From Swiss-Prot:
Skewed-composition ranges (Low complexity): 153-164
SUPFAM superfamilies according to UniProt: Histone-fold (SSF47113)
Organism of this sequence: Oryza sativa subsp. japonica
Biased composition (Gly residues): 1-36
Any Pfam family hit: CBFD_NFYB_HMF
GO cellular component: CCAAT-binding factor complex
PROSITE patterns: NFYB_HAP3 (PS00685)
Region (Subunit association domain (SAD)): 70-81
Tissue: Ubiquitous.
Name of protein: Nuclear transcription factor Y subunit B-3
Ranges in coiled-coil conformation: none
């Protein structure tokens, strides 16, 4: 293991030793050294690859080392932001980190440009989460059926689709547009 349990993000240890990076199979992975298993530290490489492919032209290719580098950067970024948010929660004597804590940490650490789109996302998420909690309390989903019947096809799920569309529009900066080989956001 390259990292000790108390070293968020790796502390400079190299992962070029041929170890699997979310490649599936390879059960276990932890040798009992007390560190975090690599598959627990990193997001799956397939997910990283899928996200990266959305940002390049359809015929573009991404080298394996580029995917692995982004995979490690994402892990480091998550640790960096979460650590700052955790420190804030400890100072405020709270045990749970919430979305607002993460946004505060991002602003504190210099990622101000991402705050507004993430606030939009967080608001939409909370609205949708609230709707799903109400539906879950109804048991078998009869609330949706009642709404469908009394409003002629206008249901809370249709509202959810509208919210998802608003979310997709708000986060459109993440999917660059390509015109004649040029990238524009």
């Amino acid at each position: 293991m390259a990292d000790g349990p108390g070293s968020p993000g790796g502390g400079g240890g190299s992962h070029e030793s041929g170890s699997p990076r979310g490649g599936g199979g390879g059960g276990g992975g932890g040798g009992g050294g007390g560190g975090v298993r690599e598959q627990d530290r990193f997001l799956p490489i397939a997910n990283i690859s899928r996200i990266m492919k959305k940002a390049i032209p359809a015929n573009g290719k991404i080298a394996k080392d580029a995917k692995e580098t982004v995979q490690e950067c994402v892990s480091e970024f998550i640790s960096f932001i979460t650590s700052e948010a955790s420190d804030k929660c400890q100072r405020e004597k709270r045990k749970t980190i919430n979305g607002d804590d993460l946004l505060w940490a991002m602003a504190t650490l210099g990622f101000e440009d991402y705050i507004e789109p993430l606030k939009v996302y967080l608001q939409k998420y909370r609205e949708m989460e609230g709707d799903s909690k109400l539906t879950a309390k109804a048991g078998d989903g009869s609330v949706k059926k009642d709404v469908l019947g009394s409003h002629g096809g206008s249901s809370s799920s249709a509202q959810g689709m509208g919210q998802q569309a608003a979310y997709n529009q708000g986060m459109g900066y993440m999917q660059p547009q390509y015109h004649n080989g040029d990238v524009s956001n």
